[in-house]
């Protein structure tokens, strides 16, 4: 089990620190997160960790070809899903928290029941290379996937059929995400571009970034759908206004030059940007002020994925090959 003191952050903010939120005016004092629990169960790098939308479950996916379902109340292992013949790069939850979908290097996606008997309900075949990223639309009748074959595919959940294939990028696709009403898809790619697509027509509506380098490693819509968080492999996170296409905020201080590390919006208590990092830490920034509020230490390898609990002030993070653990962090009451 990783050490790292007792998991408290002793970098930017510690137990006695308020970050730089201050105490004057109506700005709340920043309350630090502390290490709550370490989950062990995977035998290789954990590529993705995500809380269910109802907050009752946590799912993790790994290079070890399995996905694990955990209780998000006591963090016990509920079920281990097996079936992929290669490592899993990403997972997604349906809006009702009843189903998950996994994206694998075996060129398939699998839809799983998150309820007993935890069966594989569908295998989605069509990609011709590693499937790297996946997401459900809000009604959860469609799934979007991105692959090293440079295409985006949209799948019908009920039938498992591919209903649209978009030749989206000129290099592997690192991220795909629907907006809040399911009308738009944002995609990111190693070709240095980030694009917005009409989900129904499959047409490109806007290109947010079109640089040859650095690679765009992650992109997702904000909860209100007005902004897009974009990560690039020059250790930079940017917040873009979708309507204008302009970048409003830049977040730096973490290390991200190699892996497609996920980031997230934390909105349960204050508005934060949360990201993993290749220096084995989890970083939290104030969304508006852009300053680092806290660095969570404890993992023993790069932090590849982070997820924020939808209701509780909790964060989950997952580690690369040398770590192989999930750490749960809880904010002081």
UniProtKB/Swiss-Prot annotation:
Gene inactivation effect: No visible phenotype.
Highest taxon listed in the record's lineage: Eukaryota
GO annotation, cellular component aspect: Cul4-RING E3 ubiquitin ligase complex
Keywords on record: Repeat, WD repeat
Chain coiled-coil ranges: none
One Pfam family in the UniProt entry: Beta-prop_WDR5
Extent of the WD repeats: 1-40, 41-80, 83-122, 126-167, 169-207, 211-252, 253-295, 298-333
InterPro entries xref list: G-protein_beta_WD-40_rep, WD40/YVTN_repeat-like_dom_sf, WD40_repeat_CS, WD40_repeat_dom_sf, WD40_rpt, WD_LIS1/nudF_dynein_reg
Subunit structure as annotated in this protein's UniProt entry: Unlike WDR5A, does not interact with RBL or TRO.
Protein name in the entry: COMPASS-like H3K4 histone methylase component WDR5B
Protein species of origin: Arabidopsis thaliana
């Amino acid at each position: 089990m990783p050490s790292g003191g007792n998991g408290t952050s002793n970098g930017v903010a510690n137990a006695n620190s308020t970050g730089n939120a201050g105490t004057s005016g109506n700005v709340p004092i920043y309350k630090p997160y502390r290490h709550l629990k370490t989950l062990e169960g995977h035998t290789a790098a954990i590529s993705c960790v995500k809380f269910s939308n109802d907050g009752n479950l946590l799912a993790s996916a790994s290079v070890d070809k399995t996905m694990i379902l955990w209780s998000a109340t006591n963090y016990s292992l509920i079920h281990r899903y097996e079936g992929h013949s290669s490592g899993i790069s990403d997972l997604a939850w349906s809006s009702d928290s009843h189903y998950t979908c996994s994206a694998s290097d075996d060129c398939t996606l699998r839809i799983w029941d998150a309820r007993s008997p935890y069966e594989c309900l569908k295998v989605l075949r069509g990609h011709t290379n590693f499937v790297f990223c996946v997401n459900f639309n809000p009604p959860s009748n469609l799934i979007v996937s991105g692959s090293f074959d440079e295409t985006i595919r949209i799948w019908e959940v009920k039938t498992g059929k591919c209903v649209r294939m978009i030749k989206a990028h000129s290099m592997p696709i690192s991220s795909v995400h629907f907006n809040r009403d399911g009308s738009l898809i944002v995609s990111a790619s190693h070709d240095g571009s980030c694009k917005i697509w009409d989900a129904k027509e499959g047409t490109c509506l806007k290109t947010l970034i079109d640089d040859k380098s650095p690679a765009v490693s992650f992109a997702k819509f904000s909860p209100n759908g007005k902004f897009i968080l974009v990560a690039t492999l020059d250790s930079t996170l940017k917040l873009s206004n979708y309507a204008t296409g302009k970048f409003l905020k830049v977040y730096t201080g973490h290390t991200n030059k190699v892996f497609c590390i996920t980031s997230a919006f934390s909105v349960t208590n204050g508005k934060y940007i949360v990201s993993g990092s290749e220096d084995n830490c989890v970083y939290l920034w104030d969304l508006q002020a852009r300053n680092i509020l806290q660095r969570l230490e404890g993992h023993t390898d790069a932090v590849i994925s982070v997820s924020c609990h939808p209701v509780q002030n909790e964060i989950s993070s997952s580690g690369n090959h040398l770590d192989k653990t999930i750490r749960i962090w809880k904010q002081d009451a």
